[in-house]
C-alpha cells in the first residue's frame, strides 16, 4: 500500500469496507460455489461460469445467476433465479464464515485509534450477511 493510500485510510473519518476479499478471504469460496451450482450442466459451462465470476467480482449473484442460467439454456424465470440464489446461499454461508480473515484487517479494525466510523458495503443479501456477521468470532 502506498504511503498516500495508507495515510488516506488511517486518517479518513469514515471507511467503507467490502466484505469478500477485503474482510474475509472468501472469493474462492464463492467461485467454487458457482462452479458446483452449475456443475450439472457439464464442466465446460461450469468452468465458463467460474471464469466469468472471477473476472466480475462485486457483481451481485442476482445479476450473475440469470446470465448463467441463459448459458445453460434454462428458462430464466424469477422462481428459477430465486431457487439458484437460495442454493448458492446454502453452499457459501458456512464456508464464508470459516474462511480466513484478510491479513491485517482485524489488527486495523481493532486499533481504530482515530475513532473512525466503519461501514460495510456488500452485494451479499442483507439477511445472509447479518447471519454471517453474527457467527464470526
Map each language-model feature to its residues.
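Short, acidic loop-to-helix structural element flanking the phosphoryl-transfer center
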Residues: 2-6, 10-11, 90-120, 126, ...
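N-terminal helical cap/lid subdomain that shapes the substrate entry/recognition surface
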Residues: 9-19, 23-103, 114
Amino acid at each position: 500500500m502506498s504511503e498516500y493510500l495508507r495515510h488516506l485510510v488511517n486518517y479518513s473519518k469514515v471507511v467503507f469496507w467490502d466484505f469478500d476479499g477485503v474482510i474475509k478471504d472468501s472469493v474462492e469460496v464463492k467461485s467454487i460455489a458457482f462452479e458446483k451450482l452449475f456443475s450439472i450442466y457439464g464442466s465446460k459451462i461450469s468452468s465458463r461460469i467460474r471464469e466469468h465470476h472471477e473476472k466480475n467480482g462485486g457483481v451481485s449473484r442476482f445479476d450473475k445467476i440469470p446470465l448463467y442460467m441463459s448459458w445453460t439454456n434454462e428458462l430464466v424465470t424469477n422462481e428459477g433465479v430465486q431457487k439458484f440464489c437460495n442454493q448458492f446461499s446454502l453452499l457459501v454461508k458456512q464456508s464464508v464464515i470459516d474462511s480466513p480473515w484478510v491479513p491485517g484487517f482485524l489488527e486495523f479494525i481493532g486499533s481504530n485509534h482515530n475513532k473512525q466510523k466503519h461501514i460495510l458495503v456488500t452485494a451479499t443479501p442483507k439477511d445472509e450477511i447479518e447471519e454471517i456477521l453474527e457467527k464470526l468470532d
